[in-house]
Regions:
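Long, contiguous binding/interaction regions
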Residues: 2-69, 108-176
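Short, well-structured hydrophobic secondary-structure segments
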Residues: 40-98, 217, 221-243
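Short, conserved charged micro-motifs
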Residues: 53-54, 99-106, 298-301
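A contiguous pocket-lining binding segment that forms or flanks enzyme active sites
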Residues: 91-108, 405
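Catalytic cofactor-binding cores of redox enzymes
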Residues: 120-123, 129-138, 144, 266-294, ...
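Phosphate-rich cofactor/ligand-interacting catalytic cores and adjacent structured alpha/beta frameworks
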Residues: 170-244, 251, 289-446
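Long, hydrophobic/aromatic-enriched structural stretches that serve as scaffold segments
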Residues: 233-291
Length: 446
């Protein structure tokens, strides 16, 4: 996201700001004179410039407002007034508590919250006089730009408006990006854990056995899942931070991050491939989520996210096209060994810098399947917006959950639905297309 796009909205005039200030003063005295409180808290955001309200500012105001409504309860809230207007959002809390402990508590928020430097949390006694930090023998607030005394920097105009606004935009951007990235990573790893925990699963690792995988077990998957958490976050941040770039550029960034994620996975599993395909799919999905979320607030439009998945996923098809052209030049004797084991990552090869070779060791499982049978596999799924998950797996899962089945049983039956209807390159890799077709037919009758 371009930081210059953060603070955009309707500018207000100095006359409008003065009128808004006068209204707040009247409201302050109205609440203080009501006679049922001991002090008054005023909450607003410290936004420099003529634009006082924009999406991140309003989201931050509402987020902190919810926290204050909960945490100020210990001080006995007697009245609350909330106002959202173009001159700046603000709220009043009339409390039945001495002002000093309230001020101490609010200073801790200003000092510890990621956006605390942008919070104005003022406390007034019944005489209308605000409690100052120096009254509590505390240091003054620090400058948003240089970390010095904020009052001194303001009085001496040490920093330009542009620099102050840039730093403000960065604080907002980093806060909401990091929080959203954490949510995306949490959802991704939760999906991994749900998948491996679903029991029973034909031929796959679950809580009871390792299926057809003699080199791994349930705990191998847990180790792998834990190692990938920071990379799900990284995929999201790459999409968010570079949302203004072309999809091809974002994909190259995701490719490199995905290869590093696979290295982390192999390190955690001692060289065992547990989640290569999922790393590719998660890079596309989390990257798409980050790119879309950079310009929109929650809830994100699902179709827009899937559309971005299609764009990013389509970038990987170029590798298969280059591979196909290269394979056409090979002699008939240069065949692909479908039984060779791949020890590399499954993020698509950088064919620009590493042209595909005929040797099996240079190809991933997906590339060998494509070379032998023309099946696009995970790349094709991503380029189409993950239709197997969206149109087959998710509806099946919702159907069985709505019918009253447990999450475990609904997930197991959704898996059988996927096996019976979707093409699985792992089954093709292990037994060839005929056995994969037979397995699909068998799954339909389970």
């Amino acid at each position: 996201m371009n930081l210059t796009d953060v603070i955009t909205g309707t500018p207000v005039t100095s006359e409008e700001l003065r009128a808004a200030r006068d209204r707040r003063i009247l409201k302050k005295w109205e609440l203080l004179s009501a006679g049922d409180g001991s002090c008054l808290v005023e909450f607003s955001l410290n936004i420099a410039g003529a634009v006082k309200v924009f999406p991140f500012a309003r989201a931050a105001f509402r987020e902190e407002l919810r926290e204050l409504q909960e945490k100020l309860g210990r001080f006995s809230i007697k009245n609350t007034k909330i106002c959202e207007e173009p001159t700046g959002d603000h709220a009043f809390f009339l409390l039945d508590s001495p002002e000093i402990p309230v001020k101490q508590f609010l200073v801790s928020i200003e000092e510890s919250h990621p956006l605390g430097r942008l919070f104005n949390l003022d406390v007034y006694g019944l005489d209308g006089v605000s409690v100052k930090r120096q009254d509590l023998h505390l240091l003054p607030r620090t400058c948003l730009v240089c970390g010095g005394d904020a009052n001194t920097c303001l009085a001496q105009k040490r920093h330009s408006m542009e620099l102050i606004q840039w730093q403000t935009a960065k604080l907002f951007n980093d806060h909401f990006r990091d929080r959203s990235a954490d949510l995306a990573a949490s959802a991704a790893v939760r999906g991994q854990l749900y998948e491996v925990s679903t029991t029973p699963k034909p031929g796959l690792v679950d809580r009871n056995n390792s299926g057809s995988h003699s080199d791994m077990d349930f705990f191998t998957f847990l180790d792998s899942s834990a190692s990938l958490i920071p990379w799900f976050r990284e995929f999201f941040c790459l999409g968010w931070d570079h949302a203004d770039e072309a999809d091809e550029q974002i994909f190259e960034r995701l490719r490199y991050a995905g290869q590093r994620a696979e290295t982390a996975m192999f390190s955690a599993t001692h060289g065992i491939n547990t989640h290569k395909g999922l790393v590719f799919a998660s890079a596309i999905l989390c990257g798409a989520l980050g790119k879309v979320h950079a310009g929109k607030s929650l809830p994100l439009p699902a179709e827009e996210v899937l559309s971005e998945c299609r764009k990013l996923g389509s970038c990987s098809l170029g590798d298969l096209a280059k591979l196909s052209r290269h394979q056409n030049k090979l002699s008939p004797a240069s065949s692909i060994d479908m039984n060779s084991q791949d020890s590399r990552g499954s993020m698509p090869m950088d064919t620009k810098n590493h042209p595909p070779q005929a040797e099996p060791s240079a190809l991933s499982n997906g590339e060998r399947i494509f070379s032998a049978y023309g099946i696009q596999g995970a790349r094709g799924e991503a380029a189409a917006g993950f239709p197997s998950a969206v149109r087959i797996g998710l509806p099946a899962l919702k159907k069985w959950l709505a019918a009253g089945f447990s999450l475990n049983d609904a997930a197991a039956m959704a898996l059988l639905t996927l096996i019976s209807e979707a093409d699985d390159t792992n089954m093709v890799h292990r037994g060839g297309p005929e056995l994969a077709k037979k397995s699909k037919e068998q799954a339909k009758h389970l």
